[in-house]
């Protein structure tokens, strides 16, 4: 409730100068939790693989249910940016493994990641994407939380843990990710490329979501901590609680 109240206050229109002045203490307090960019390499870049060496075969990606279309990355924090504004988004969109360097990118048309994809398509350029895995659980929660448009998910994560998230620049693109996450899968989506059939997938509803066509994500780098732990979730029929798997690499 406190988070919701703060976000509503921060995003509320302030027509008068007096309204803006009254908002200063709130905004000053929130500034303590804004993400910070740091120079150099982060813990998530202690081991770096690029090019042909950046193989997803190094990850224990799971097939969760018998009729799933394949193996899926199920706890990806997908980092994208709007090409016009530079505003960041972090969302959670499952990723079906097609080969060692290619996955699907399952963002529905109403998700911010899909809107960023459409903007990159209009620009005629490839879309940089970086997928973070693991790290502070606040990151995973923030990636799934219902947030107002243009509100930074890493700000919410900073508020929840009472300290700002430190971000580092990726190795092969200009996306910034949490310095202390476990893995980062760097790559791109080419909006000019034909979409691929993704699914089925045993989903939260207790039913399989059907096959559909989604963009392809191509891997350019795989970085990780030396003591990385791979996170995954297996969703199922309510009221089952989603299972969380932590696999040490």
Residue ranges and their predicted role:
Residues 249:
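Calmodulin-binding IQ motif helices
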Residues 1-216, 220-246:
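Extended, highly charged
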